[in-house]
């Protein structure tokens, strides 16, 4: 099974599927925001950033998926983005399903000074809603934050298998 992950990770199709899946989720979020007028909360913005991180990882690997260093760099970006997305979706799920005064969102989106996405692209990366449990949205009996938790968990599991397959192949050659 690890060999299959290793072989697929060296193909452009693998990375194109990763890019398409993350862009699909970003598109759904933007559709909800602009067409259905559902304003994103701060945790939604952070999850959106994690999806952009996964997309960037896929784009980097798409340049040359057979180059080991580039592929490993992309997998680590993917892994980090999936972990951060899982973290934010878990917090979002907890605040949505179990609202309390101890679980609250930040008042403002905070990005590093060297990457102020909320100032560069406020229409995508800024939120006017600081209350993360004010608008729970359901799809097929699950709240959106639960779906995002599931998606980030799938991204994380696939990224872990992919990085293990890379390490397995590197050590097997020696």
UniProtKB/Swiss-Prot annotation:
What GO MF annotations does this protein's record show?
A: electron transfer activity; protein-disulfide reductase activity
Any single GO CC term annotated in Swiss-Prot or TrEMBL for this entry: plasma membrane
Instruction: Report keywords, A-Z.
Output: Cell inner membrane, Cell membrane, Chaperone, Disulfide bond, Electron transport, Membrane, Oxidoreductase, Redox-active center, Transmembrane, Transmembrane helix, Transport
Keyword Membrane present in the record's keywords: the answer is yes
Instruction: Identify the residue ranges that face the Periplasmic compartment according to the record.
Output: 32-49, 91-146
Segments on the Cytoplasmic side according to the record's topology features? 1-14, 66-72, 166-174
Q: Does the keyword Transmembrane helix apply?
A: yes
- Disulfide bond residue pairs: 41-44, 105-132
Q: Which GO terms describe its biological process?
A: protein folding
Record-annotated membrane-spanning stretches: 15-31, 50-65, 73-90, 147-165
Q: How does it sit in the membrane?
A: Multi-pass membrane protein
Q: Which Pfam families does this UniProt record tie to the protein?
A: DsbB
Where in or outside the cell it occurs: the entry states: Cell inner membrane
Q: What does this protein do?
A: Required for disulfide bond formation in some periplasmic proteins. Acts by oxidizing the DsbA protein.
Please state which protein family the record places this protein in: Belongs to the DsbB family.
Checking NCBIfam families in the record gives:
PRK01749.1
The name of this protein is Disulfide bond formation protein B
Q: What species was this sequence derived from?
A: Blochmanniella floridana
The upper taxonomy is: Bacteria, Pseudomonadati, Pseudomonadota, Gammaproteobacteria, Enterobacterales
């Amino acid at each position: 099974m690890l060999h299959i992950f290793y072989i697929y990770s060296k193909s452009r199709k693998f990375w194109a599927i990763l890019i398409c899946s993350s862009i699909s989720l970003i598109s759904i979020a933007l559709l909800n925001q602009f067409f259905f007028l559902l304003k994103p909360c701060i945790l939604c913005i952070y999850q959106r950033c994690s999806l952009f991180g996964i997309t960037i990882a896929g784009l980097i690997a798409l340049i040359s998926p057979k180059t080991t260093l580039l592929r490993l760099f992309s997998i680590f970006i993917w892994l980090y983005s999936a972990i951060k997305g899982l973290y934010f979706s878990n917090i979002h799920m907890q605040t949505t399903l179990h609202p309390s005064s101890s679980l609250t969102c930040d008042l403002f989106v905070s990005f590093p000074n060297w990457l102020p996405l909320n100032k560069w692209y406020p229409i995508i990366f800024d939120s006017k809603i600081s209350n993360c449990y004010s608008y729970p949205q359901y799809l097929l009996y699950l709240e959106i934050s639960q779906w995002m938790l599931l998606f980030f968990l799938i991204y994380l599991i696939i990224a872990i298998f992919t990085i293990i397959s890379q390490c397995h192949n590197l050590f097997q050659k020696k």
